[in-house]
Regions:
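Glyoxalase I/VOC metalloenzyme domain signal
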Residues: 1-29, 35-56, 73-136, 152-249
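N-terminal juxtadomain amphipathic helix
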Residues: 57, 67-68
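Short beta-strand
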Residues: 58-59, 139-142
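Short secondary-structure boundary/capping segments within folded domains
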Residues: 60-61, 70-72
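Short acidic/glycine-enriched loop/turn segments that link adjacent beta-strands
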Residues: 62-66, 143-147
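Short hydrophobic/aromatic beta-strand element in the GNAT-like acyltransferase core
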Residues: 68, 78, 148-149
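Catalytic micro-motifs at enzyme active sites that drive phosphoryl/nucleotidyl and oxygen chemistry
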Residues: 136-140, 148-149
């Protein structure tokens, strides 16, 4: 199947209703994608040790010779794995990985991954499940706003299971740390209360390339072509909607 087979050529890009959206924000992590050199080992660990079922394993859309796997945390939250044939296997602590949940690592890299359960009882049950598979666990630890256990996963992953929700920003934004981060009192109020946005009937035009803004890294010509394409062209050209194993009719 080609990418253009999945969506009719005349299919328009999705549209939205014009409205002020005071609470518009991402409401969770749909999937966190982790690079791997051993898809089977990762899926096996997450199923056996953590109880997370494998929900998808297929050729990654638009990427040659690359596997994409998903394990389920909940119905709208997954851990994903990407096995590209050129993925390096070397771990360099402090650069590619943090050595432990409190260790330094390159900015933008994953420091540790914390997964939610509802109660301390479930945290302790997860501790026992993980230990029953021979994996050592540190904790529990009460951080005040969350209660956590810490352990390691394949390929140098630093993992955490915790319970806790509804963090009170009036208690948990330390003025000393705020100042050391160069954040003024006015700025912290803006960070605590992001401004609403008014979304119009017409899509916001793609902004011009600006090196001062975050950008995905592609070869220059490829990047300009992708960012210069219309939303409808991307929707029609890159969408792949058919699962690899269709349900029987």
């Amino acid at each position: 199947m080609t990418t253009t087979d999945a969506v009719p050529a005349a299919s328009p890009a999705p549209t939205i209703e014009a409205v002020i959206r005071p609470h518009l924000r991402p409401r969770g992590v749909n999937h966190l994608a982790i690079s791997t050199t051993d898809m089977k080992a990762q899926l096996t660990y997450w199923a056996d040790v953590l109880g997370c079922p494998t929900k998808a394993l297929y050729w990654m859309h638009g990427v040659d010779n690359t596997f994409h796997g998903f394990v389920e945390l909940s119905g709208d939250s997954y851990i994903a794995f990407v096995q590209h044939p050129d993925n390096p296997s070397e771990v360099e602590y402090g650069v590619t990985h943090a050595a432990n949940p409190g260790a330094p690592v390159t900015g933008g890299a994953t420091q540790h991954i914390a997964m939610h359960v509802d109660t301390l009882d479930e945290v302790l049950a997860m501790r026992d499940r993980i230990r029953s598979h021979g994996v050592q666990v540190m904790g529990p630890i009460d951080h005040g706003m969350i209660k956590s256990i810490y352990f390691a996963g394949p390929e140098g992953l630093n993992l955490e299971v915790c319970c806790g929700s509804d963090i009170d920003e009036n208690q948990w934004i330390d003025p000393e740390v705020q100042g050391l981060c160069g954040i003024s009192d006015d700025e912290v109020e803006r960070l605590k209360h992001p401004a609403p946005i008014e979304i119009g009937e017409s899509p916001v035009a793609q902004p011009a390339t600006d090196s001062s803004k975050p950008q995905m890294s592609y070869p220059s010509a490829v990047y300009e072509a992708l960012m210069g394409a219309s939303d409808a062209d991307i929707w029609n050209g890159a969408s792949e909607t058919s699962p690899p194993v269709p349900l029987p009719e």
